[in-house]
């Protein structure tokens, strides 16, 4: 039987695009971990997806996971839209290129290693763990130390 854990994630951006960050909390029976990082130039949606990627990359075993996010973009993207995008050769229903393809591909790959229930929660409603993720994401955005290379390449193209 797979171990059960809960993951709380949030992304933030000071301006969109602008400096951004993510916050992650992973908690289980004998596990509690906080992860955060900030980027010089990125978008809020990229930070939301990145938070999920970083959370899943940090796991070394297979888990039964509940991922809590306040991003409908992330939840709908990974649970509904990605199937349509892939069938449309990474185009939206409006025939536009899907944004953040690099992150969606990585997230889908990592998601297949676990059983994940993607849970949308309303942000800023006194959920202690989610509020902590929000705090970590904002602090990281204010103190960036990393470059979102793919985003900057697209931005400078």
UniProtKB/Swiss-Prot annotation:
Binding residues annotated for Mg(2+) 2, in chain numbering: 10, 134
EC number: 3.1.26.4
InterPro entries, A to Z: RNase_H, RNaseH-like_sf, RNaseH_domain, RNaseH_sf, RNaseHI
Coiled coil: none
Metal-binding listed as a keyword: yes
Primary residence: cytoplasm
Ranges of residues in domain RNase H type-1: 1-142
Gene Ontology MF terms: magnesium ion binding; nucleic acid binding; RNA-DNA hybrid ribonuclease activity
Catalysed reactions, as listed in the record: Endonucleolytic cleavage to 5'-phosphomonoester
GO cellular component: cytoplasm
Enzyme class: hydrolase
Purpose: Endonuclease that specifically degrades the RNA of RNA-DNA hybrids.
Protein name per UniProt: Ribonuclease H
Organism: Wigglesworthia glossinidia brevipalpis
């Amino acid at each position: 039987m797979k171990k059960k854990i809960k993951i709380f994630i949030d992304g933030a951006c000071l301006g969109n695009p602008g400096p951004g960050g993510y916050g992650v909390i992973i908690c289980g029976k004998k596990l509690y971990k906080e992860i955060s990082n900030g980027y010089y130039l990125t978008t809020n949606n990229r930070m939301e997806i990145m938070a999920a990627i970083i959370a899943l990359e940090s796991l070394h075993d297979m888990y039964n996971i509940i991922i809590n996010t306040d991003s409908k973009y992330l939840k709908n993207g990974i649970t509904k839209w990605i199937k349509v995008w892939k069938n449309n050769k990474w185009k939206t229903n409006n025939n536009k290129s899907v944004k953040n393809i690099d992150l969606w591909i990585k997230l889908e790959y990592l998601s297949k290693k676990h059983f994940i229930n993607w849970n949308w929660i309303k942000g800023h409603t006194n959920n202690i763990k989610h509020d902590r993720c929000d705090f970590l994401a904002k602090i990281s955005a204010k103190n960036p130390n990393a470059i979102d290379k793919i985003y900057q390449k697209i931005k400078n193209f």
